[in-house]
């Protein structure tokens, strides 16, 4: 599945993305380390290759979806947005994302989340999409709130951000009915009024 928006394209990650992702992550290590549980020190090519192999396998089995966040015009990969394993029985999933520091603050992540929601709700027909972010991750919380996710509560010390360091997590969610009621407004607000184009593999 590929999803095309106004400025962004979401496309499945593949093994050839490894070198680019290593470069982006390591250039953003100081910012990512504070909020990403998998980010300790600089990542190696071997570690990224292993992640991409798992990501491709999960996508092939429809267990989870891992997308490169790509600038539509330049074709540059600038981050990753993905689901955690999908609970197909309950038609629900949680999502996560990161963007390289050099591209943050420009609305790219917000657009990417809206595009992913379109794919999850309208194509995969999921019932519920959730996202958790550390309470002190101001930028991520702002993105989720702008889009219109419903705040569900705080999970006490549920996010591990270092071997012996934990943070509280804000939990947000959207139901399919909630998304459909705000869908047109989201496109007007974040996609220049254009509907996303979803291409199924």
Predicted regions and their residues:
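Conserved GNAT-fold acetyl-CoA-binding loop/helix
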Residues: 33-53
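Residue-level detector of secondary-structure transition/capping positions
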Residues: 26-29, 40, 56
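A short helix-loop-beta-strand connector motif used in the catalytic cores of GNAT acetyltransferases and
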Residues: 53-68
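Acyl-donor (CoA/ACP) binding surface of acyl/acetyltransferases
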Residues: 1-20, 24-31, 66, 70-201
């Amino acid at each position: 599945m590929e999803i095309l928006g106004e400025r962004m394209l979401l496309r499945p990650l593949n093994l050839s993305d490894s070198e680019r992702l290593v470069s982006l992550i390591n250039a953003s290590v100081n910012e990512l380390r504070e909020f990403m549980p998998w980010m300790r020190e600089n990542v190696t090519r071997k570690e990224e290759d292993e992640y991409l192999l798992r990501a491709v396998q999960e996508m092939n089995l429809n267990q989870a979806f891992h997308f490169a966040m790509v600038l539509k015009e330049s074709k540059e990969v600038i981050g990753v947005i993905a689901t955690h394993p999908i609970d197909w029985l309950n038609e629900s999933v949680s999502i996560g994302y990161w963007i390289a520091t050099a591209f943050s603050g420009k609305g790219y992540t917000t657009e990417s989340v809206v595009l992913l929601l379109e794919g999850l709700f309208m194509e995969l027909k999921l019932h519920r999409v959730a996202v958790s972010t550390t309470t002190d991750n101001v930028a991520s919380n702002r993105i989720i709130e702008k889009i219109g996710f419903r705040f569900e509560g705080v999970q006490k010390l549920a996010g591990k951000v270092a071997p012996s360091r934990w943070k509280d997590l804000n939990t947000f969610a959207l139901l399919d009915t909630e998304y459909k009621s705000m869908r047109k407004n989201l496109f007007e607000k974040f996609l220049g009024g254009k509907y996303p184009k979803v291409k199924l593999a």
